[in-house]
Design a protein with these regions (language model features):
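Hydrophobic pocket/interface hotspot
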Residues: 16-21, 27, 51, 64, ...
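Short coil-to-beta-strand transition motifs
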Residues: 32, 56-59
Length: 152
């Protein structure tokens, strides 16, 4: 099992940041590895809402496991999706902006010996993506690692 966390400060109000992040369909706007996120349930943005995510090299089904508006959001993969993932994001209003703490717990299916390498690689991607989220929300535009230019 791989676990890590990172944090980012975004100079935007917590209500704006949370609403943007909680809209899972917007993940491809700040995560270059994700191509699309499509709702698979009638209700979206609530506990139990489900989504299908297509990434560069795989696909997952996701579920909103917990949501406390403007405070926390927990997303999990739905078995048999791989990697097995639980992502918990907490949001705090701070100095007129928002601090996000992003905690990951995942089973990537790699041998235990390779977990540190896999964890470092995953964490590096998360750090880059949080930086892209910050830039997009603060400036209204961002260029992702794959060259896509995104505007809000």
């Amino acid at each position: 099992m791989i676990t890590f966390e990172d944090a980012v400060f975004i100079e935007r109000p917590i209500e704006e940041v949370f609403a943007f992040v909680a809209d899972l369909q917007k993940i491809p706007m700040w995560n270059y590895y994700v191509r699309s996120v499509t709702p698979t349930s009638v209700e979206t943005g609530a506990v139990g809402s489900t989504y299908h995510q297509i990434r560069k090299s795989d696909e997952q089904d996701l579920r909103v496991a917990h949501i406390d508006w403007n405070r926390s959001l927990v997303i999990e993969t739905i078995p048999p999706s791989r990697p097995e993932l639980r992502r918990e994001m907490t949001f705090q209003a701070q100095d007129g902006g928002t601090r996000i703490v992003d905690r990951w717990r995942m089973n990537m299916g790699v041998p235990k010996l390779l977990e540190p390498l896999a964890a470092n690689r995953a964490k590096a991607g998360v750090v880059q993506n949080l930086g892209k989220l910050k830039m997009l929300l603060e400036t209204g535009r961002v260029t992702l690692q794959d060259g896509r230019s995104i505007s809000r």
